[in-house]
């Protein structure tokens, strides 16, 4: 069988995929062909010889090139029978370590002249090798050439045959290099780099195919004969690759230098990055660099070029671009270069190194400067994708996540302080909740991949705690009033218990940030008292649900008084049942009356005084007092008329009867109009003994207004319903029942008018809180000193600040210490003035 010459370079393009793989494998296709061609020749061989030949089907080249060397040690005697198996040993060496050695030694290239057949065999072999290298047809079959190689090796001429073959391949590689020199004379540029790569690609496309065919012909020499010698000789494939390396990349390991091929490859990659069409064997040439073991040198060159390029890009773009646009550009560059490397490089380390280099140059070196360019606008945009891109790119850099966290904290404080300073009271809590919801959305959507999520959440908590407590008393008051609105029966925004529970949880989060929780408690207690006394609570279960959440946050000591308020309400219901039994026992008419007996310790402080109660109401109150004395051993009750309410049956005119839900003061005032048609403020005060300010407040409520029931009207001005002048003018007017009352509902609730200003109410709460804080400071000092017996001032201050749950100044603590010294709970140490002793 005669083998045809390999196709020429021009026809190899149709087999580009096969040739690309030929640089990575040992051309199993060629070896398979060889096995078929040799099949006819094996019939005349011994079994031992067949075993040797059959080893040609083994795969020896891994991923495109040999990284192992072989050497043969031990007994290699050829005087035994031909079917005695030769012992072989494989010695592994680093090919690159040998790259700096001199070219393969040629040794003695004289074929033994005593055997004319050896010379004739070499002549045939060399002619056919030249034919393969020169793309000519071989004159001898591959089986015949294989037999001649075996014949020469059997005559102990293996080393000489090896050297002569290497010399031919060296000359062939030099001829290929000379064909490339014409192209290398032209200066390299982006517009001609593809031509250079195309020429180099053609050279590499042909080289491994030809030498692999030659290697298969000399397979016996490569696997058997050379392995039996005592010298360490490179396998043919490794030797041929080393020849290519030394020819086309001379001295590359002695001193790193960028070859023209490296520059051309980089230019082609940059053109691809700029979205220009590139027609060059880029992947094939990168594979070639791996095959001839210079890929690491190219990787160093590529990294240095990328570092220079992207450093210049960063310097140019950072001053001109905002944070979002710059991060979008960085992500695009990283993704596209990563894809380019994935397509053209097999080594995972190449992708990792390129990504790290681009990230370092574009982002690591730009932090924290780029984060100051419209960072707030990026967060304000609520674009989870853009914010997430910025965060994910920064967190890949050393200290990047910390910088984002710092900028995010500044943003939160800036926006939060602006809300505290500019929002009106009625909108502040809702704005804070909306801001918190937005930030939570960013945290879960954009920052979910944080390397340290605990620090990220702590950053959020610290920022909110910072600005919520900028005006701590105001924040505490408004948050408590927000709870009052949620739990009030007039709240129309709550459709079911689930919605209410969710809204309460959101408000609890704001409450958690408060430092002055005792201020919140004071306001919350007032709101709760109003809801309970006036029966305006949306649900007792909802009230207790909130109480449970507050207890979970702050402990039972915080909710002790609030829980006591509910205990009083439950006890009052029980008293109501017992009171009805008492009336029945005393043969008195059952009264439509409910009393709330409260423990002063639990409830807000209220001013109490006696007023003139109409007889029909006074008798019932007297009966309840008698009942309570019976129940509690002559203990008396004190009535808080300002907290009471009543239902009045009113007849404004024939056919117009209504039920009015009014406060106790409003009820007493309205009942006066059964005695006389007109009354002045002064007359009402005189007959009821109600404070003038309370009379004015309740008369205003009865006069009503827009969208409010007008139970009374002014006499002066023809019964004008218009409220004119000040409170002083109101005192000089007369009032009469509005006979034209037109409310459509049968039961009408009369609204309350609060004349007391917010400043006055705040002052009262502040005084109450300060008084309560004094007791808490005193108790904490005594508790600490009782346990420690003696402490210096600084240690005592430290332990106090750890135990107290509200903000307190050192001046306030010093005042309480002086008070305790005066009351002889503690004393100063006579030997150390800065220390205190506990007084038993």
Curated annotation (Swiss-Prot):
Query: Which pathway features in its UniProt record?
Result: Protein modification; protein ubiquitination
A GO cellular-component term linked to this record: Cul4-RING E3 ubiquitin ligase complex
> Where is this chain compositionally biased, Polar residues type?
1-11, 69-82
Q: Which part of the chain holds the cross-link Glycyl lysine isopeptide (Lys-Gly) (interchain with G-Cter in NEDD8)? A: 786
The uppermost taxa in this organism's lineage are: Eukaryota, Metazoa, Ecdysozoa, Nematoda, Chromadorea
The encoding gene? cul-4
Q: Name one GO molecular function term.
A: ubiquitin protein ligase binding
Q: What name does the UniProt record give this protein?
A: Cullin-4
Q: Record's SUPFAM superfamilies?
A: Cullin homology domain, Cullin repeat-like, Winged helix' DNA-binding domain
Cite the Cullin neddylation domain residue spans from the record.
772-831
Query: What is the protein's quaternary organization?
Result: Part of an E3 ubiquitin-protein ligase complex including cul-4 and ddb-1.
* Pfam families noted in UniProt: Cullin, Cullin_Nedd8
GO annotations under biological process?
A: DNA damage response; proteasome-mediated ubiquitin-dependent protein catabolic process; protein ubiquitination
Role noted for this protein: Component of cullin-based E3 ubiquitin-protein ligase complexes which mediate the ubiquitination and subsequent proteasomal degradation of target proteins. The functional specificity of the E3 ubiquitin-protein ligase complex depends on the variable substrate recognition component. In association with ddb-1 directs ubiquitination of cdt-1 during S phase and is required for restraining DNA rereplication. Probably is involved in ubiquitination of cki-1.
Q: Where is the composition biased (Basic and acidic residues)?
A: 33-48
Region (Disordered) residue spans: 1-82
Ranges annotated as spanning the membrane? none
PTM comment: the record says: Neddylated. Deneddylated via its interaction with the COP9 signalosome (CSN) complex.
The text of the family note is: Belongs to the cullin family.
Organism of origin is Caenorhabditis elegans
What keywords appear on the UniProt entry?
A: Isopeptide bond, Ubl conjugation, Ubl conjugation pathway
Q: Which PANTHER family match?
A: CULLIN
